[in-house]
Amino acid sequence: MAESVAHPSVLNATEEDIKQLLAASCHIGSKNLDVRMENYVWKRRADGVNIINIGKTWEKIVLAARVIATIENPADVCVISARPYGHRAVLKFAAHTGATAIAGRFTPGNFTNYITRTYREPRLIVVTDPRADHQAIKEASYVNIPVIALCDTDSPLAHVDIAIPTNNKGYKSIGLVWWLLAREVLRLRGALSRTAPWDIMVDMYFYRDPEAEREEEAKAVEAEAEAPAVEAAEFEPTAEGAVDPSILAAATAGQVGQSAWDEEGDWNTTGAAQTSDWANTVA
């Protein structure tokens, strides 16, 4: 499925890259097929699911990375994702490459209404899903902003300049494509060597369900509560009103020649101890 492409051999996908794309189900398309996406489909399964050509997926990832790397100011690249599965991916991509991220709802007028506080003038936008991010693509077409999009087999390609064919409905496939794109951009900029592996794990780009995280935290708290408590030191309780001999010994330690505190007798008949006159003492 991974066909040879026209770019230099140094930009070719490695066996590990192809395995990652297959493991993340980037090659699994939908049952529907847009006419413009036919060139990216390898074959159609018996159950009607279209299989995307992984070789062309990698080719478009490299092409998109080369376009992004040509932008002098990284902040002029705007990465957008209205789908929750792409929120974490675009935020991580922006953090690693210096791009501007819009995760969540795209406010209409961001690219066309200069009166709004969120007005931006990017030189390039990258979207996760042309269908979910249609408002951003539509406004970009009004102001001549190039568009790069992650496209499934049923995605509309209107106003999309570079389509990266992939499964844009799974959180693993979305996160992996954004991770590969960020890594390739850093390599083209010279910030990352091609011989050394990237220390950022692909899992950092995957979507995480907040509800699942809360459940894991709750389970951890319950596990700590069920853990056996530390056993207290054993001691023998004394009768009410009695004095523990060990405590009495510690209290009277070093008091040689002094009467016991519980000695019977009339304390009023005993005079106070003689004190020295400190005023007459000469230093």
UniProtKB/Swiss-Prot annotation:
CDD domains: RPS2 (cd01425). Belongs to the universal ribosomal protein uS2 family. HAMAP family: Ribosomal_S2_euk. The lineage of its organism: Eukaryota, Fungi, Dikarya, Ascomycota, Taphrinomycotina. The keyword Protein biosynthesis does not apply. Keywords: Cytoplasm, Ribonucleoprotein, Ribosomal protein. The keyword Hydrolase does not apply. It comes from the Eukaryota. Residues 254-283 are annotated as: Disordered. It is found in: Cytoplasm. This is Small ribosomal subunit protein uS2B.
